[in-house]
Amino acid sequence: LIVVPCVSPWGYETINRWDPLAIDPNRSFYPDSPAPESKLLMDFIGAMQQEFLLHIDLHETTDTDNSEFRPALAARDAIEQKAWEIPDGFYLVADAKAPHLPLQQAIINEVKKVTHIAPTDENGLIIGAEVPSEGVICYDKRKLFLCGGFNNATYCSTTEVYPDSPTATPEICNRAQVAAVEGALQHLLK
């Protein structure tokens, strides 16, 4: 069991998706990454020369994703950024290439004991993505250079808690993350 407590400490402390170099570490998991945080984690894991059964990536999304990050990204890169409603609640991002929905549902079922699951929007989507199972969306993690795609773990999930929810507290968000890990491990031990 390997636990990496915080891949992007500066981003966490400043409630910011970027690192001090204005790079999004979570979308920088590729060889020769310009994000030192991503490169260090890949080097650390790569040096182990291990196959991994599970990769679970614990995230939180705050309102600053739309109020600060997306406008700054649009200004910097001159690319229109579509803002979407940040879901009020917990949800998961599975790997589109291998979603393993029973694992995702086991995580959701455990988290439901602690906090609410993000509902879909009026189009039946969460952040613009289809929802194949309650509280679950899928991204191609390798193609997007996401943390969950760099190590070829058999099972993969990324959690998203929403600390800006009027019904959430830091304690609830932390308990939801613990419940997610517990749900994943319990599922694998069955």
Where do the language-model regions lie?
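Structured catalytic-domain cores with a bias toward divalent-metal coordination
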Residues: 1-190
